[in-house]
């Protein structure tokens, strides 16, 4: 069963002069196993939206269910793993081992089961066991993010929810996180990420949700998103669309620089071949 939001609204500072409608009549469905990107400008309501998925916030109106359960149930706390933008704000233990084991211990798993989950999560984020005794705060930004991710994975969630997981990381750190998330999704866990980094995430996304001023203005597949008007696109995709509009026979559904280069060279070769054949016919 999926995460379902039905006619959900949420207000900050309700019934005060500072009342702000963060979400308005939101309807959303996220299936197990999907890789979902939640897009939108700052203040659009993205972070508020994902906090409804496991009961961190309570909607003012409407209904939220996770696999048919209330988001405030203990089982949903296990089902929906959360990873916030700043990993350092989520880490507090003295060692990587303690950090990853924290969730299973608090859910009452045995020592043996907890250790199995720690090693499983460690492997999922591509760390070896030598990391377990390291101080989390001695690690790089990308490594800290992976420790926080391992902590969430130790509960074997059905849905992994992330808020800007690669913001502030260097290129190597971004690459590590993106590869890890793809691996997690391929193993059957739904990955739901708030992101501004279309360049990094777009090739991975299966479903896109666009939030504008507290409302969902688009939800659909990546292919449907590319056909939609007035939606933000990765720079390379915008460039390919512009080339197509100017008459070049390129495929505009390109998401990476590597794909764009390959497509441009393919079209260049084709046009040169056609030009040569035309000259041959003239001769």
Curated annotation (Swiss-Prot):
<keyword id="KW-1278">Translocase</keyword>
<dbReference type="Pfam" id="PF00005">
    <property type="entry name" value="ABC_tran"/>
</dbReference>
<dbReference type="InterPro" id="IPR003439">
    <property type="entry name" value="ABC_transporter-like_ATP-bd"/>
</dbReference>
<dbReference type="InterPro" id="IPR003593">
    <property type="entry name" value="AAA+_ATPase"/>
</dbReference>
<dbReference type="GO" id="GO:0042626">
    <property type="term" value="F:ATPase-coupled transmembrane transporter activity"/>
</dbReference>
<keyword id="KW-0813">Transport</keyword>
<feature type="domain" description="ABC transporter">
    <location>
        <begin position="3"/>
        <end position="238"/>
    </location>
</feature>
<dbReference type="GO" id="GO:0043190">
    <property type="term" value="C:ATP-binding cassette (ABC) transporter complex"/>
</dbReference>
<comment type="function">
    <text>Probably part of an ABC transporter complex. Responsible for energy coupling to the transport system.</text>
</comment>
<feature type="binding site">
    <location>
        <begin position="40"/>
        <end position="47"/>
    </location>
    <ligand>
        <name>ATP</name>
    </ligand>
</feature>
<keyword id="KW-0067">ATP-binding</keyword>
<dbReference type="InterPro" id="IPR050095">
    <property type="entry name" value="ECF_ABC_transporter_ATP-bd"/>
</dbReference>
<keyword id="KW-0547">Nucleotide-binding</keyword>
<dbReference type="InterPro" id="IPR017871">
    <property type="entry name" value="ABC_transporter-like_CS"/>
</dbReference>
<keyword id="KW-0472">Membrane</keyword>
<dbReference type="GO" id="GO:0016887">
    <property type="term" value="F:ATP hydrolysis activity"/>
</dbReference>
<keyword id="KW-1003">Cell membrane</keyword>
<dbReference type="InterPro" id="IPR015856">
    <property type="entry name" value="ABC_transpr_CbiO/EcfA_su"/>
</dbReference>
<dbReference type="InterPro" id="IPR027417">
    <property type="entry name" value="P-loop_NTPase"/>
</dbReference>
<protein>
    <recommendedName>
        <fullName>Putative ABC transporter ATP-binding protein MA_4342</fullName>
        <ecNumber>7.-.-.-</ecNumber>
    </recommendedName>
</protein>
<comment type="similarity">
    <text>Belongs to the ABC transporter superfamily.</text>
</comment>
<dbReference type="GO" id="GO:0005524">
    <property type="term" value="F:ATP binding"/>
</dbReference>
């Amino acid at each position: 069963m999926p995460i379902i939001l039905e006619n959900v609204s949420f207000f900050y500072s309700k019934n005060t002069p500072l009342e702000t409608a963060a979400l308005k009549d939101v309807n959303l469905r996220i299936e197990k196993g999907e890789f979902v990107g939640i897009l939108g400008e700052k203040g659009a309501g993205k972070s508020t939206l994902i906090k409804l998925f496991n009961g961190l916030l309570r909607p003012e109106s409407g209904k939220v269910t996770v696999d048919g359960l209330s988001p405030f149930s203990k089982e949903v706390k296990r089902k929906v793993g959360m990873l916030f933008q700043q990993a350092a704000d989520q880490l507090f233990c003295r060692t990587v081992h303690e950090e990853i084991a924290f969730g299973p211990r608090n859910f009452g798993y045995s020592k043996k089961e907890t250790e199995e989950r720690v090693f499983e999560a460690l492997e999922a984020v591509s760390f070896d066991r030598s990391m377990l005794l390291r101080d989390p705060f001695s690690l790089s930004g990308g490594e800290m993010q992976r420790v926080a991710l391992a902590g969430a994975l130790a509960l074997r969630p059905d849905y992994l929810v992330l808020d800007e997981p690669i913001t502030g990381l260097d290129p190597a750190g971004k690459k590590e996180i993106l590869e890890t998330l793809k691996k997690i999704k391929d193993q059957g866990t739904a990955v739901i990420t708030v992101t501004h980094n279309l360049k990094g995430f777009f090739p991975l996304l299966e479903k896109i949700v666009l939030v504008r001023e507290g409302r969902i203005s688009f939800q659909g597949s990546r292919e449907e998103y590319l056909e939609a008007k007035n939606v933000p696109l990765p720079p390379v995709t915008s460039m390919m669309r512009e080339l197509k509009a100017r008459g070049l026979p390129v495929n505009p559904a390109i998401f990476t620089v590597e794909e764009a280069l390959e497509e441009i060279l393919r079209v260049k070769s084709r046009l040169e071949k056609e030009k040569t054949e035309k000259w041959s016919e003239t001769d």
